Amino acid sequence: MLGLLLTSLANDPANSWLSYAAWTSPSGKPISFVNTSWVVPNDPAQSYGSNAPGWWYGIQTSNGDGALIQPILAYGYQGSFYSIFNACFDWTDGSWHTSPEKYTVQPGDKLTSSVTYNKGDNSCTPQPALKTRTRDC
């Protein structure tokens, strides 16, 4: 694990991420689907600035350029609460776009999100799906 971590830190595409992981398909075929489930954590002690937490995963080309498609769970993006939304950062021109759909979520909510590859038009569709959004009491 340490070797992977050192390699990952050495190739940090943004020179600022705390950590990240990379995977390359041994067959060279594109990743067709990525899914994750997460539980919204408690509100942070400090809510803004560099202390505001955010979590995401993303899909991009094997060259590490072009569009980085990513569902994001972030605190403080729209106010003093958590939101989940989709975003796209384009490494080629530095542009940043977010989806018009942004959902407010609460600590304890269980969320799922996914990114699906569409072979027909060589695109990806992210979903910050709230279909499993529930709260444990």
Each predicted region: which residue ranges?
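Exposed, interaction-prone regions of secreted/extracellular proteins
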Residues: 6-137
